[in-house]
């Protein structure tokens, strides 16, 4: 089994940056490993659609298909792993529950390491939460480069 100590430390460092920058949530949206950020944080890959939620309070949530959920659970990195029947409503429901005001997503105009969210995945995600929530989206390039530097990546 893979050792997740490094990834646990990375998640801790990300949480500290979220607090420092007053960003409520870092949300990674992926499908079939499309976002290379998942190799760094959380360090768990998915075959199906997946989402990883990291709050500034230190809560960690994984949303995974039945096929992927076991790996996400066995990593020991998450407070809760939600197996979805309907990915879109599960992600939207968790966003509503968390009710963030500022959300960091993995997009960037200047840092390719922070630009793993595809336009198609982004538009699909936005279409499924439209009218349900309002929050400011910011780039993960506000903190990921510093976290990578501290963790020698």
Please report, for each region that a protein language model flagged, where it lies by residue:
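N-terminal accessory/capping or targeting/presequence segment of soluble
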Residues: 1-93
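Flexible, acidic/His-enriched mid-domain "rim/lid" segments that flank
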Residues: 6, 86-153
């Amino acid at each position: 089994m893979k050792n997740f100590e490094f990834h646990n430390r990375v998640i801790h460092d990300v949480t500290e940056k979220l607090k420092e920058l007053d960003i409520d949530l870092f949300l990674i949206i992926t499908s079939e490993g499309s976002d290379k950020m998942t190799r760094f944080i959380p360090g768990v890959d998915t075959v199906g659609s997946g989402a990883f939620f990291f709050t500034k309070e230190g809560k960690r949530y994984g949303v995974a298909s039945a096929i992927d959920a076991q790996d996400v659970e066995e990593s020991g990195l998450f407070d809760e792993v939600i197996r979805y029947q309907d990915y879109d409503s599960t992600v939207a429901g968790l966003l509503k529950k968390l009710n963030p005001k500022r959300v960091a997503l993995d997009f960037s105009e200047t840092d390719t390491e922070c630009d793993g969210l595809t336009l198609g995945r982004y538009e699909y995600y936005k279409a499924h939460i439209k009218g349900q929530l309002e929050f400011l989206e910011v780039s993960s390039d506000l903190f990921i480069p510093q976290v990578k530097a501290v963790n020698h990546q």
